[in-house]
Amino acid sequence: MFLIWTFIVAVLAIQTKSVVAQSCRTPNGLNGNCVSVYECQALLAILNNQRRTQQDEKFLRDSQCGTKNSVPAVCCPCNAADGQQGNCVNINSCPYVLQLLKNPNEANLNYVRGSVCQGSEQQSICCVTAPQSTAVTTTPRPKRVHACQSEMTATPPNPEGKCCGRDIAVGDKIVGGAPASIDSYPWLVVIEYVRLERTMLLCGGALISGKYVLTAGHCVKGAILDVGTPKTVRLGEYNTTNPGRDCVSVSAGGTDCTDPLVKIGIEKTIPHPDYQPYHFLRKHDIGLIRLQSIAPFTDFIRPICLPSTDYTVNPPSKFALTVAGWGRYLQFDNGTVRSSKIKLHVTLPFVQRDVCEANQKPLRNGQRITLWKGQMCAGGEAGKDSCKGDSGGPLMYEHSKKYEAVGIVSFGPEKCGQIDIPGVYTNVYEYLPWIQNTIEP
């Protein structure tokens, strides 16, 4: 028993927190956590189902447990690593997990790590009464021979080809800050920062070739470096708290799982030479990250296209843009990082630069913010903005069934999702010559 307990501590030590979520009971009798509705995949799927029944609506009402930062909170059941719902209990009360820890191989440990939940006790696990095999049963995917792997070089793929900007997401995507499909936006990356052996996820970016990630200047230069040094990037990520394969239930039945997470070391970071990190206008807020090795091309990892034109000059009618990510950004005033554990996305309206300027709040000295053509704006709708994406992540436009990285998340109002106060993004098209001249073979 002592040996098992040693493994429990080793497996869960990195996951425990000094403050745990409020425990609750779901309408169907499962132990759960009271969390923002945006963080509960199971209930969001019901909420966004236009064909939900009266029984579904009653279940949603009965699941409410208060509010979190003015957002409705719900009693959310936990999910084990294989995607099954379970009870969030102390690990010693879960016979199946204790049995796995008697044989602590990599598969069993990944299952346990992926099943950690925030219960009323620190060492809590999502325990299922009839678990699936730890060899996760997945919804079969068509076998693909990726011809595009040969184009995963340092140079961004030709946007006229088929090797950038395409995802293979199954099913309808949900907008409004809700979970994205497990295989959508496969170019999204999470940047790992390290300080004193502590790893932090502070910024995002977009893979634009086999060797380069596009991100914000403030993610690779300035105050953020006092917090940590960018060391590695995560590719093919979905749930940042799960070190193993991420799995979700699919409507057709079964479970859809990602490939194993890929981490690649950072060879060097390259902020734009004219970026001034402490200037309030955040001009030239763009940077590149060169990776130590070539990224693979898979269903879950592939580059986004660079913009084919400056869409801010003659915007298309009903010009809708998308941001996606884990909502990660560092709040320098108090040093906290706000984030979601799963990939989110939201659709935002384009806002003309002059309208955006007029709606930005003046600085403390009364000075108005003046934007230039290297910046663009989107958002300004209640509860919907780039807080659902990542600092440094891409602002995307879907054109001819391909996504282009037209912007980079730069800055916005202190409080996310305020009406008539759009977020400000770096206009990537303005920097195409710099990107092309900076990339090395």
Curated annotation (Swiss-Prot):
Give the signal sequence positions: 1-21
Question: Which PROSITE patterns does this chain map to?
Answer: CLIP (PS51888), TRYPSIN_DOM (PS50240), TRYPSIN_HIS (PS00134), TRYPSIN_SER (PS00135)
- Annotated active site residues, numbered on this chain, are 218, 285, 391
Q: Which domain of life is it from?
A: Eukaryota
| Pyrrolidone carboxylic acid: modified positions | 22
In short, the EC number is 3.4.21.-
Q: Gene3D superfamilies from the xrefs?
A: 3.30.1640.30, Trypsin-like serine proteases
Q: Which residues form the Peptidase S1 domain?
A: 174-440
Q: Per the UniProt entry, what are the Gene Ontology biological process annotations, in alphabetical order?
A: protein processing
Task: Write down the top EC class of this protein.
Answer: hydrolase
Asked if the keyword Hydrolase belongs to this entry, the reply reads yes
Subunit and partners: In the active form, heterodimer of a light chain and a heavy chain; disulfide-linked.
Domain remarks:
The clip domain consists of 35-55 residues which are 'knitted' together usually by 3 conserved disulfide bonds forming a clip-like compact structure.
Q: What does this protein do?
A: Endopeptidase with selective post-Arg cleavage site. Activates prophenoloxidase. Has a probable role in the melanization process as part of the innate immune response.
Name used for this protein in its record: Phenoloxidase-activating enzyme
